Amino acid sequence: AKRMSIMGICNKLAWPVAPLFFALVVADQTNVQTSDLYLPFYIIIGVFLLLGIISLMAPLPEVKAAGEDESDTANCPYAANKTSIWQFPHLVLGALTLFIYVGVETLSLSTAVDYAKALNLENPDLYAWIPSIGMVIGYICGIILIPQYLTQDMAMRICACIGVAGSLAIVLLPAEISIWAIFLMALGCSLMWPALWPLAMADLGKFTKSGSALLTMAIAGGAVIPTVFGFLQEGLGAQGAYWLALPCFLFILYYGVAGYKIRTK
């Protein structure tokens, strides 16, 4: 959880930095042409290629979880008689929870600027920092508190409750004030990944790699949930569309309370 929190800080700081990078590369933002997008994307492609080469050449060790070896059943007896990852209900529910979480996290990180524009607030681009600051503060708390003071499931429950409170605040407070509640919504998302991943991956044994692949595919929620949000905006408006976040956080809370404990014989 600590390592994931540290990497999360690096990841979330990039959200507000990216628009600033684009502003530096594109001189005239009032008249942006398609050709102006080539240079920043060439730079991004170059950075990714460089990182890929470095990762390929780095002597990274093969890491195995307890019981991951096919012949090793002593360390993970629960997985010994299983034949498929679909026989792990806590993993399947965890993948669904991760799908929902990534979607609602993407909402908190990517909609602040558009919401500020819809409210006709000055300098809407500056509001991109609100969710990022919330996420980073949450990650710092995770580094300090997990596992010495908070268990992973407890951290998940606390964050889900914060997310529920933030979602309600966004839709119920006056619009000009509600945009600041996106901070709470983002704070509620902060420790989800470091808390959810270990809970969903527990007791998988020889299915650890397959379970990890299933959870990774659940990241697609970051594309699906915002799309649903966009459709809701057309009918409910910029503020009302945030009702979508409430059932998402409630399901996450369910998983943190009971879902991760479910096991089959």
Please place each PLM-identified region on the residue numbering:
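Intracellular juxtamembrane helix-capping segments at the cytosolic ends
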Residues: 1, 190-205
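Helix-loop-helix hairpin linking two adjacent transmembrane segments in secondary transporters
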Residues: 2-60
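A membrane-interface helix-boundary motif in multi-pass transporters
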Residues: 24-45, 154, 228-249
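Helix-to-loop junctions at the C-terminal end of transmembrane segments
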Residues: 26, 138-152, 233
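Multi-pass alpha-helical transporter architecture, strongest
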Residues: 50-59, 246-265
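Juxtamembrane intracellular "pre-TM" segments in multi-pass secondary transporters
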Residues: 65-94
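Extracytoplasmic gate region of multi-pass secondary transporters
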Residues: 83-129, 135
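C-terminal transmembrane helical hairpin of 12-TM major facilitator-type secondary transporters
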Residues: 151-196
